[in-house]
From Swiss-Prot:
Organism: Homo sapiens
Claim: Transmembrane helix is one of the keywords in the record: yes
Coiled-coil positions: none
Superkingdom field: Eukaryota
Name the record gives this protein: ADP-ribosylation factor-like protein 6-interacting protein 6
The gene coding this protein: ARL6IP6
Residue ranges with Acidic residues bias: 38-48
Length: 226
């Protein structure tokens, strides 16, 4: 019999039969869990130390992660944190704040490049129109009053094919830069596997329209020069 059990029994004898005594919990006592004196108390202290260490680790981890959360999520006017929308793994608010100083020069440069390209294209089309007009006007009439062109078949064919190829190349390039696979080389009307899964089409309609534009341009030039 241990010292704790003898003290507990003597306390019960001293109390009267009508006096309520404290509820004894011998199964949860730290003195009766071990075989000898103080063994259960040592085990309980070790468990408490382990819990305390775990709590300290959690508190330290929370203290380290809290400034990062505050830096990423700034508080609102009422003190509540603002949760930004995350798209493709990037916070657009942070990205927009960094790209804000460089936004207007890029836009101005793109507008100037577009205007320069449009002016160059208009200049080339004007030259082509003058050439086609002069070639169409240079016709001779024979004795039977039949117009005879100065251009031969092969010359007419080469000019028509050159115009059609130029138009097709321009449309093909625009479609290439505006397609779902701009990094694919060489560009092909046949759709890659990813594009086929997205749209369900087995061919790229934009490249087919580029080829059709070239054919129409070649036929138009040939008809004008005849």
């Amino acid at each position: 019999m241990s010292f704790a059990e003898s003290g507990w029994r003597s306390a019960l004898r001293r109390r009267g039969p009508g006096t309520p005594g404290p509820v004894a919990r011998p199964s949860y006592s730290s003195f009766t869990q071990g075989d000898s004196w103080g063994e259960g108390e040592v085990d309980e202290e070790e468990g408490c130390d382990q819990v305390a260490r775990d709590l300290r680790a959690e508190f330290s981890a929370g203290a380290w992660s809290e400034p990062r959360k505050r830096s990423v999520l700034p508080p609102d006017g009422n003190g509540s944190p603002v949760l930004p929308d995350k798209r493709n793994g990037i916070f657009p608010a942070a990205a927009g704040s960094r790209a804000q100083p460089r936004r207007w020069p890029v836009q101005v440069l793109s507008i100037l490049c577009s205007l320069l390209f449009a002016i160059l294209l208009a200049f080339l089309l004007a030259i082509a129109y003058l050439i086609v007009k002069e070639l169409h006007a240079e016709n001779l009439k024979n004795e039977d009053d039949v117009d005879t062109g100065l251009l031969g078949f092969w010359t007419l064919l080469i000019i028509s094919l050159t115009a059609g190829f130029s138009c097709c190349s321009f449309s093909w390039t625009v479609t290439y830069f505006d397609s779902f696979e701009p990094g694919m080389f060489p560009p092909t009307p046949l759709s890659p596997a990813r594009f086929k899964k997205l749209t369900g089409h087995s061919f790229h309609m934009g490249y087919s329209m580029a080829i059709l534009n070239g054919i129409v341009a070649a036929l138009t030039v040939a008809w004008c020069l005849m």
